[in-house]
Amino acid sequence: MMNKVIKLILFLLSFSFSQGKMNSIGLGKFYSNQGVDNAMDGVNTLAPSILKNVNFSNPSTWHNLKFTYLSLSYSSDQTSFENFSLANAYSGLSNALWVIPIKSKYSIGLSISPYINQKVSLVEQDTVVFIAFEDTLHISRSFKRSGGLLSMNMGSSYQLTRKISLGIMANVLFGSSRQNESVKFSGSNTIQTTRSRYNGLISNFFLSMKLRNEIMLYSSFKKTLKPVENAQLDKHLFNDANSNGFHDWSSPYFDFPFPDSVTSYSEYRISDVHNPAGFQFGISKILNKKWSFAFEWSSEFENSKELQNIDFPVNNWIYETNSFKTSFSKFANSTSLNILDKISIRSGLKYSSYTLGNSEKVIQEYGCSIGSGYKFKSVGNQ
């Protein structure tokens, strides 16, 4: 019975505090590469999803809303490894959005969402063994990092003509992380702790254009206004005598040197660790006023000049990302008396390729998404 309880606890811990493989590449795993941005848009980031002519990830469509909208999305992610019976998963708030349309011509919106997940824990499998002074010594290394970046997003739209609409989104990035590099020498841990603070500013410009026969064309352009800066503080090396991972006074053993005997090194700044640029194109076709087919393509590049000066768990980073998406959606009709007409459906397929900057290897991902909703009334919950 006790063994079953222990196995259950270990399973829950691995489910709650696990990691994805891409967390160890570069600054961490970008949530934009993880899956859907929010529960309403599905795989779409430009084309309509649950409402005709509206995508909550595309500010140039916000003025088409009839009422103010508040959206909260919660997501989970699971990563499995080929040839291994391992499944890593984590979950959390994926997006909180508030949009206010103004006279069907303008709109403003505010949202907050996670941007990068930096959680990773690596332990070297190969332990170095050697004999010295008639004693067998073992050396192994480990790397642990936690934290990440959030994005505070402020957007607006303006209907230029009956067929052309413009949108803009400013992404204020901020966050922090902590990492420990440890060398275990025959039961004794020597640890180097580093703390980092991040801030940056990215802008996105959007265009929506109505063509003939219910065909819509979308595009967006991403430009970095202020590259993400890393303020890094390296702590003094210490011997973790009590094996708790912290530089402290906990008994029965005391870490060496004592915490009050040393000071941290001076904080230094790395001014350009994330500098993305990219563009997106999309096209959608409305059928019978309640169905939509859409295709989207995007490409993004990492133009950082200082990214290589940061210690990574894996000595690599994503230099280029290309994605292709196709989706099929059904809009809900809140005025219909038929229950089936009040149900919205969104589904899609996604293909992404990530080119690594150091080795130029390519990681390929294939994904699918399906979701549904129910419209209770014109103004209300869904």
PLM region spans:
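Hydrophobic h-region of N-terminal signal peptides that target proteins for export
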Residues: L10-S18
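N-terminal, post-signal peptide beta-strand-biased segments of exported outer-membrane/organellar beta-barrel
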Residues: F17-I116
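Outer-membrane beta-barrel porins/channels
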Residues: Q19-A39, T45, K103-Q382
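Short, low-complexity interaction segments enriched in Ser/Thr/Pro/Gly
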Residues: M1-K4, S18
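Sec-dependent signal peptide recognition
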Residues: N3-F11
